[in-house]
Amino acid sequence: VSMENGARNGEKLRAGVLSMARDGAERGLVESAFLDWLEDECRVGFPWSMIDKITPHPSERVQEELGRLGVADMAIARTNTGTLIAPFVNAEITEYLVLEDAFPNGRPALEGAGVYLTDRTTVEKAEKMKVGTCLNPLHTALAVYGCLLGYTSIAAEMGDADLKALVEHIAAESLPVVEDPGIL
């Protein structure tokens, strides 16, 4: 299952896996029977997914908490391009995973963990709603203008009446053109 947050991610994962397997077959590293098995969609599934879980830059608060718990070597570093990196990932609590229920060999009870299992069309609608209309454009607008105004978090930006009004206006213009996926 691809957790890459992009359109048709299962299709892209399948293409990548098959490309590597075909290359392996051409080199004599993979038997043709394995390649046939891998290409059989009745045997191997590459379901599409849409995940929504914001993972901001590494938090010093999370780093300190990990240190208190005895977890070593959790230093936050800055790359040559200015990106903050760390051996841990902190994330917002809110999360959504919409997953195409396309598992030809069965699957665990993912719905018990809050996963939305549905058909491919609904996954695609949810992805378009998030990426193209209801979340990413709003977040991007806040990020750009917030940075220009000196803010360091989306939460702080939402406390600014002008930025909040901007986001509400963008949302009001966007919502009429989005197709409700029927979930979320």
Map each language-model feature to its residues.
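Substrate/ligand-engaging "lid" and interaction regions
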Residues: 1-184
